[in-house]
């Protein structure tokens, strides 16, 4: 009897351990298609007569681990109900809403170790928000919040486009050596935690940086460097982004695993086609996915908009929505404090299209 009881306890222990292990979500690229766990996204599906297999619709949710290390600006981000800023609450509410986004059809989102402007667009950025310290080491309070998000994304089979640097925070980095250290430390952290659902964006809109390794003349070297960092024979898929309407340099197109574009400033949807075609016509381009991960144009109720034209050009599209002046708390996914729920008409318009994709044949 004792042996039977012991065997049962061992069996229960094994089952318990197996349940504790999170299923790994792995993103990969085959040609110009994204695969999740060995299968193309939206396998075999079309939408309005357009191929969507292999595309990666996404949203810019860069401030999921936001905090402000500057006492003089922290007051700007207080919640309307508590009148206090709370970085842990921000991440907690982000994670709580992730299943709702996934259920509506969102496959991926961009988050950044230095966030993005908590005001949407800003002329001056006095706040200090960075998971990367001035010397390139990592701030573990930020990384612990990031882990909550990456773990949940892994569970939900969602892909994370992880940005490292944001131009508003470049001034807090010591020098180009610290930038390189930051790349090394962040990539090694991702690999050693065995996250396989992460795509890497070196920096958001490289046009605006001055430091070597981040500026448009040298960022291709950082892409190449990040690709050399491995753990157990595995590396991350790497790219970077430029400002709205810009086409990446031939050097960046050549070394990137996928191409990132921004649609800000593109008011005529036909210009989306021009931008995508310009990438494919580059002599440096080889077959690889093209992804918008920032576009602040909507009009989702109209037959033609930037989302539709990107899809028609076979490029994944990314939704960027921030709360405009005098808009209520529910608006936008970037301004802090953020309402991470789908509680505005703009958000509902975007997610309604994703639901159409999810249910497409």
Can you say where each PLM-predicted feature lies in the sequence?
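Active-site mouth of glycoside hydrolases
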Residues: 30, 35, 40-41, 46-256, ...
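Extracellular glycoside hydrolase catalytic/binding regions
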Residues: 182-184, 197-199, 203-351
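Generic N-terminal initiation segments characterized by hydrophobic and/or small/turn-forming residues
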Residues: 4-9, 53, 153, 258, ...
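Basic side chains
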Residues: 2-3, 60, 110, 288
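Generic hydrophobic-segment detector
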Residues: 3-6, 28-29, 143
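Extended substrate-binding grooves/exosites of carbohydrate-active enzymes
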Residues: 25, 32-33, 40-88, 287-292, ...
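Generic structural signal for short, solvent-exposed loop/turn connectors between secondary structure elements
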Residues: 1-3, 21, 167-181, 245, ...
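Bacterial Sec-dependent N-terminal signal peptides
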Residues: 1-23
């Amino acid at each position: 009897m004792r042996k039977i009881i012991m065997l049962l306890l061992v069996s229960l222990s094994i089952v318990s351990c197996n349940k504790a292990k999170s299923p790994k979500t792995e993103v990969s690229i085959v040609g110009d298609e994204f695969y999740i766990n060995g299968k193309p996204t939206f396998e075999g599906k079309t939408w309005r007569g357009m191929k969507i297999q292999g595309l990666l619709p996404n949203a810019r949710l860069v401030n999921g681990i936001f905090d402000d290390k500057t006492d003089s600006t922290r007051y700007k981000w207080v919640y309307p109900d508590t009148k206090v800023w709370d970085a842990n609450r921000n991440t907690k509410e982000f994670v709580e809403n992730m299943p709702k986004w996934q259920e509506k059809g969102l496959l991926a989102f961009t988050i950044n170790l230095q966030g993005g402007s908590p005001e949407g667009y800003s002329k001056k950025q006095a706040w200090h928000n960075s998971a990367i310290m001035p010397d390139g080491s990592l701030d573990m309070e930020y990384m612990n919040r990031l882990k909550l998000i990456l773990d949940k994304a892994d569970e939900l089979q969602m892909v994370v486009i992880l940005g490292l640097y944001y131009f508003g925070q470049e001034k807090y980095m010591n020098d180009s050596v610290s930038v390189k250290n930051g790349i090394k430390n962040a990539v090694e952290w991702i690999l050693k935690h065995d996250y396989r659902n992460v795509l890497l964006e070196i920096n958001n809109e490289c046009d605006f940086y001055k430091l070597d390794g981040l500026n448009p003349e040298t960022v291709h070297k950082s892409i190449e460097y990040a690709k050399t960092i491995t753990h157990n024979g595995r590396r991350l898929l790497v790219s970077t982004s430029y400002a709205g309407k810009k086409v990446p340099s031939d050097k960046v197109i050549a070394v990137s695993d996928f191409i990132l574009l921004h649609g800000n400033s593109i008011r005529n949807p036909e210009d989306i086609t021009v931008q995508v075609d310009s990438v494919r016509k580059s002599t440096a381009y080889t077959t690889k996915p093209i992804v918008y991960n920032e576009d602040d144009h909507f009009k989702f109720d109209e037959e033609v908009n930037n989302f539709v034209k990107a899809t028609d050009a076979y490029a994944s599209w990314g939704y960027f929505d921030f709360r405009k002046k005098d808009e209520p708390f529910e608006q936008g996914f970037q301004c802090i404090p953020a309402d991470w729920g789908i509680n505005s008409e703009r958000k509902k318009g975007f997610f309604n299209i994703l639901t159409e994709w999810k249910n497409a044949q």
